[in-house]
UniProtKB/Swiss-Prot annotation:
Gene3D superfamilies from the UniProt entry: Argininosuccinate synthetase, chain A, domain 2, HUPs, Single helix bin
Compartment list: Cytoplasm
Name this protein carries in UniProt: Argininosuccinate synthase
Species in which this protein is naturally found: Clostridium botulinum (strain Alaska E43 / Type E3)
Pathway membership, UniProt: Amino-acid biosynthesis; L-arginine biosynthesis; L-arginine from L-ornithine and carbamoyl phosphate: step 2/3
Domain of life (superkingdom): Bacteria
Binding site for L-aspartate: T120, N124, D125
Amino-acid biosynthesis among keywords: yes
Enzyme Commission code: 6.3.4.5
Stored NCBIfam families: argG (TIGR00032), PRK00509.1 (NF001770)
Gene name, Swiss-Prot/TrEMBL: argG
Record field: catalytic activity: L-citrulline + L-aspartate + ATP = 2-(N(omega)-L-arginino)succinate + AMP + diphosphate + H(+)
Length: 407
């Protein structure tokens, strides 16, 4: 392979990126600069710099992207109501563009020849990373070892790491593929690859209790929203990162947001994963219910179509595109009145709306009551039905006329 002077590596400290450091040095005779995007992995970041240097990197950039991640990527996606295939809250999908953008920025500072990532050739993340890089530096060389090297499986990776004394925490028996950030934790591989197998939740779950271990009494919380963003929990104002952290703790305790799904990957195959998204699931539910109170019918119905498209764009790595940006502007406009307070009951994986209020509520008890009211003349419905049903009547009479002619 051609010699390179300096390569920027998207580094997590996991198995893939740990063995890529010696592989790059062996194959390109280059300096490797590791970059870790901190998007809320917490304890996974402990000792990362020491590990990267010990493995062969010249330095490690530890970039704290958590605030930007929550405010500029997570919250706009919540406002959009974007959920991929009805289940996946896009935990990995919207983290990759942000990290990819930062990789390009550091590559320019360092004068690097290439950017390298550890995504497999079967996954979605290779697309997300590389499209982000191309969006900010279309001429940057990208190295994707999984598409080049002789390593064919995670078992091969472990063997490679052991032969080069690369420190790893996993082994052949507990080799789940995981991705963690402040929004979620995903689990893939091993027994999960066969959809007939029930997930071993007591062994897999890290952020959440299983349903069986969740408290036998419900937990009540109150969330306050301003223009579509959660700003307070139980009456206490919080920044976005702190609020999500607190919801993760509360939701995890009550087994909220555990999803087992088979999804359609961008690259053409189906894959199965178990996702833990405790705080995010609470925010989605609260935001959606408050929108029901505050959005008019036409906006609400049209926004459902936008939500589906927005989810596809994010999942497919198209965050930095004119369409995603345009949809975000539309969504931002719809959120101007999504302000209010909602009380939620959390119990063994369930989230129940326990009451909500908003100064922009479009719900009128005077009009909606089943009791006697003085504002709604029910006789007006007759004229409405006559006009609304006119196309149906015209069509029915046309068929009646045709039947008479046939006779």
């Amino acid at each position: 392979m051609n010699k390179l002077n300096k390569v920027i590596l998207a580094y997590s400290g996991g198995l893939d990126t740990s063995i890529i450091i010696p592989w790059l040095k062996e194959n390109y005779n280059c300096e490797v600069i590791a970059v870790c995007g901190n998007v809320g992995q917490k304890d996974e970041l402990d000792g990362l710099e020491e590990k990267a240097i010990k493995t062969g990197a010249s330095k490690l950039y530890m970039e704290d992207l958590t605030k930007e991640f929550v405010e500029d990527y997570i919250f706009p996606t919540i406002q959009a109501g974007a959920i991929y295939e009805g289940k996946y809250l896009l935990g990995t999908s919207f983290a990759r563009p942000l990290i990819g953008k930062r990789l390009v920025e550091i590559a320019k500072v360092e004068g690097a020849d290439a950017i390298c990532h550890g995504c497999t050739g079967k996954g979605n993340d290779q697309v997300r990373f590389e499209l982000a890089v191309k969006a900010f530096d279309p001429d940057m060389k990208i190295i994707a070892p999984w598409r080049i090297w002789d390593i064919k499986s995670r078992e091969d990776e472990i063997t490679y790491a052991e032969a080069r004394n690369v420190p790893i925490k996993i082994n052949h028996e507990t080799n789940y593929s995981k991705d963690k950030n402040i929004w979620h934790l995903s689990h893939e591989g091993l027994d999960l690859e066969d959809p007939k197998n029930e997930p071993k939740y007591d062994e897999i779950l890290e952020l959440s209790n299983s349903l069986e271990k969740a408290p036998n009494e419900p937990t009540y919380i109150t969330l306050t929203f301003e223009k579509g963003n959660a700003v307070a929990l139980n009456g206490e104002k919080m920044d976005a990162v702190t609020l999500l952290d607190e919801l993760n703790k509360i939701g995890g305790k009550n087994a909220i947001g555990i999803t087992d799904m088979v999804e359609n990957r961008l690259v053409g195959m189906k894959s199965r994963g178990v996702y833990e998204t405790p705080g995010g699931t609470i925010l989605y539910k609260a935001h959606k219910d408050l929108e029901e109170l505050c959005l008019d019918k036409e906006t609400s119905h049209y926004k459902e179509q936008i939500s589906l498209k927005f989810a596809d764009l994010v999942y497919n790595g198209l965050w930095f595109t004119p369409l995603r940006e345009a949809l975000s502007e539309f969504i931002k406009k719809t959120q101007e009145t999504v302000t209010g307070e909602i009380k939620l009951k959390l119990y063994k994986g369930n989230i129940v709306n326990a009451g909500m209020t908003s100064p922009y509520s479009l719900y009128s008890e005077e009009y909606a009551t089943f009791g006697e009211d003085a504002v709604y003349n029910q006789n007006d419905s007759a004229g409405f039905i006559t006009l609304y049903g006119l196309p149906t009547v015209v069509k029915a009479k046309m068929y009646q006329s045709l039947k008479k002619e046939d006779k």
